Amino acid sequence: MADEDIEHAIDNVMSIDDQDDDTRLYIGSARNADLLEVVTIVRDDGSELVIHAMKMRPKYRRLLPGD
């Protein structure tokens, strides 16, 4: 997956789900409009590091607005 698609998904986020383990799940669109799931770890200084990115799985559809 291209870094540009991951950045696009985070910049054009449709849903953010903060997890209990200092990770954050973003649901957003790639440049071609495919929905992606992107997981970041939130560092102590507030910056984030992407640790997972792939096409959104159906189990996350519930996080989308209107679903």
Residue ranges and their predicted role:
Residues M1-D67:
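Ribonuclease/tRNase effector modules and their secretory precursors
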